[in-house]
Amino acid sequence: MNNNIVAIVGRPNVGKSTLFNRLIQRREAIVDSVSGVTRDRNYGKSEWNGKEFSVIDTGGYVRGSDDVFEGEIRKQVELAIDEADVIIFVVDVEEGITPMDETVAKLLRKVTKPVLLAVNKVDNAMREKDAIEFYNLGLGDYYTFASISGSGTGDLLDALIDAFPEKPEPAEAAEELPRFAVVGRPNAGKSSFINALIGQDRYIVTDIAGTTRDAIDTKFDRFGFEFNLVDTAGIRRKAKVKEDLEFYSVMRSVRAIEHADVCILVIDATRGFEGQDQSIFWLAEKNRKGVVILVNKWDLVEKDTMSSRDYEEKIRKELMPFTDVPILFVSALTKQRLLKALEATVQVFENRKQRISTSKFNEYMLKVIEAYPPPAMKGKYVKIKYCMQLPTQTPQFVFFANLPQYVKEPYKRYLENKIRDNWDFAGVPIDIYIREK
């Protein structure tokens, strides 16, 4: 619940992405990773000594990072200061201290959050000696490492874990209610939707738990539904951070998404389903959260240009392969379909915690498998004789087979589709595992 967020900052080409990839690989060796996409280089989860945390590579979001203006780096660091619990500042021992390093260090010296100065490419005794120069940045002790070989990353991770702030567990009463987070790119209408939904200015309400650094649960009762609204937007918003890149909206969404049960993704009907929307949707899916998509400002769209059905179909193509998601057309301004939106969100919450008895699951799925068995591989037939839902927080299903290695992704998608055909898992990611019987 109280997952820590780590931001890796620094100028281009100092090894931020290599360090990020090394941290994420540690996690993938422990758990089954969600099928990756190219955006995995920006955000991932890691674990060290039993503590889980999320890692964001700020450099991964900068296009044309060979020629990034100093102002862009400054904005990234300011946002990391706002959003992260711990900041790793990566520098390059080969190049020594550069003017841009000094600019970043000047910003970081002003913050009270933990900052770990990580000197990269230190792989011999001479470079250990050269690294002493980085004391001049005024950030205290530093940690030397070599991101390519992995040397020194263990000490860096030990220091990282020690730097995590102590976070109180939320009150039990807050835990029992569904947690909904309203997410989306800037100016899509998130604030208008929240204010229309709760019928009051959200800054007036009383917080149940949390600090300005944490996602805050605020309890509401609307249309007969009790829920907690996970709110991070507005608490740390600063006008000086111009949110015009994918990085900003995604970074601002991370904590709310990780803290929520269901994410309400608000998109601007006048702009369509853009790259930032896709990234936030992917972030929710990767975290195995429920998702509802609200197409806001639908009242502003010329209806003769595109029908809601065409618009919805276009969005679903962008969501593939996870297309079983409720899409509603709303207007926060006129309060059109707000009740429907909340009802859909509550239903997704119920879908996410749905449990199917093993007997019923086998009765249906074994018939499905018998009608269309897995393709034979190398003259060998795959036989699945037993299946069940795992006792996990999110829907996960395991199928026991004699040759699990021969069951490929297309057949796993077929199994998922058949599960969705028979049970309502709309808005909820499903995991399918094939294990040896």
Curated annotation (Swiss-Prot):
InterPro entries cross-referenced by the UniProt entry: G_ENGA, GTP-bd, GTPase_Der, KH_dom-like, KH_dom-like_a/b, P-loop_NTPase, Small_GTP-bd
Family, as annotated: Belongs to the TRAFAC class TrmE-Era-EngA-EngB-Septin-like GTPase superfamily. EngA (Der) GTPase family.
Domain of life per record: Bacteria
Repeat in keyword set: yes
GO terms of biological process kind: ribosome biogenesis
EngA-type G domain sequence ranges: 4-168, 178-353
Family matches, as HAMAP family: GTPase_Der
Gene field: der
Keywords: GTP-binding, Nucleotide-binding, Repeat, Ribosome biogenesis
Job of this protein: GTPase that plays an essential role in the late steps of ribosome biogenesis.
KH-like domain span: 354-437
Positions with a binding annotation for GTP 1: 10-17, 57-61, 120-123
The protein's name in its UniProt record: GTPase Der
Pfam families: KH_dom-like, MMR_HSR1
